Structure formats: C-alpha cells, structure tokens
Amino acid sequence: SNYGASLHKKSMRGWMWHGGSPKEDIEDNLRVLRERSRDAYMGVPLATGAIKTMRTNVVCGGLTPTPQIDNAFLGISDEEAQKINEQIAREFALWANKPTCDADRIDNFYMLQQLAFTGFLLNGDSWAVLQNKKTPGVPYDLRVRIIEADRICSPAFMDILSPTDINEHHVEKIVQGVETDADGMVIAYWVCDRHPLASTSVTGLTASHWTRVEAYGKKTGRQNVLCLMQRERAGQLRGVPLLAPVLESLKPVSYTHLR
C-alpha cells in the first residue's frame, strides 16, 4: 500500500501501532489523560488560553430561554401569547438568576454552564445531577449539582465486565462508572461520595462509598443525570479531554521558562 497502511515506506517503518476497543484505547487511559490535561491547564499558558477562549466563545453569556408558545394551537390571541411568554421568561429568571439553583449554592445557572463546559474540555465529559430540595423563600425546588468527571467511576475503581452483584444491585457491566444492561444501553451511573484524588481518599475506598444513580427515574422517566460528552467511536462511554492529542507537544512548552 502507498497509503497509511504501508509497512515498507521509511516514514512508516518505525510506527508501532496497537488497536483496541474504545475501552482499551480510551477508558483505560482516562485517569492519566485527565490529570495531565488539568496540569497543563494550570501550568501551561498556551493550554490555559485555549480552554478559556473556547469556553468564552461557546458559552458566552449562557443559554437563555426564548418562549414562543403556539397561540394558534392554544386558541388565544397574539397579545395573550405575548403575556404568557413574558411570564415564562420571568419565572425562569426567578430560578436561574440566583445561586439557589446550584446545589452548592455558589453559582447561578449561567455560571454553572461555564463550569460544566470547562469540565467538559478539561476532562472529556462533564456531569450534572438534577436534585429537588425545598428551601424557605425559594419557589422552585430544582437544584443542579455539577460533578467532576473523576467521581463518576466504577466501584472500588474496578470495571465490571461480567454479571455480578454490587451493593445489593445486580449489574451486567460497569465501565468507568457507566452501567449498561445486557443490550449495551446505559441504565445507571456510579458516583463516588468524594473526589477519588482527594487526600482523604488515598486509602480505604470500598464499594460502599459509591452510590448508584439511575439514568432515568422509574416513575417520572425524567433524566436524573446529564452528561456533556462528544463521542468519537461507537461503544464509547466516556469522553476524551480536548488537550489529549497535544499533551506531548505542550510538555516542552512548560519548560520554556528554564531556557
């Protein structure tokens, strides 16, 4: 072959390749990729600028609703529809503009979007758990909890590739915290109750420290967990950090101050 499969061209002879499934090529290497990606973000200005510029250009002020109800279908006038649209926007702002929409009670909804997108770029995927919590003086109970990708991981850090029981749950397969059924459909996520890389998590984490969260509520059918990820291969369950392909090139840049 005269193309990429050539075994005789001088430029290709030294290419040591190895193929695998998405698990071998991606999921099994994610911990190293995430940690190196975050390290580059914190210590290499080129990486920092790339991530922040993309976040600003994509998220900007954040997604905002633009209600446009179908007044013809509802049988109401344009003026009535406009009043309802304005009321919907006001009610959404009542929830979104305050940090009470954040389960951590720090960011408003638009700042949460920036946080989630930054995590997606740095870690390959970003996660949000939708919770309900009554708070005095707050009319809406919905809370958004952003979870860093590291906390979505397999119990005791061991992927399950054959049927077994964990914490009184029968599971078919768990890869990097994503549980699938016998047909390969995602049905649940396993969340560690603390960050696995925290100083208090170095030892002593057993399967009991993980909580199984169903992807969809049994009664409501509502999504319990939102995952921001871009798949690149069929069968892929976790995302790849944006900086992964250029980490090797960024490494020498971090030493430029020594020259």
Regions found by a protein language model. Name each.
Residues 194-211:
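Short, surface-exposed, low-complexity cationic segments
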Residues 256-257:
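Conserved small/polar residues in nucleotide/adenosyl-binding loops
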Residues 241-248:
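Alpha-helical multipass membrane-protein architecture
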Residues 211-225:
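Intrinsically disordered, low-complexity terminal regions enriched in charged/polar residues
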Residues 253:
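Short amphipathic alpha-helical segment within the helicase RecA-like ATPase core
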Residues 226, 230-241:
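Signature of lipid phosphatidyltransferase scaffolds
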Residues 115-197:
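Extended, Lys/Arg-enriched charged tracts that mediate electrostatic binding to polyanionic substrates
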Residues 1-122, 130-141:
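Extended, helix-rich architectural segments
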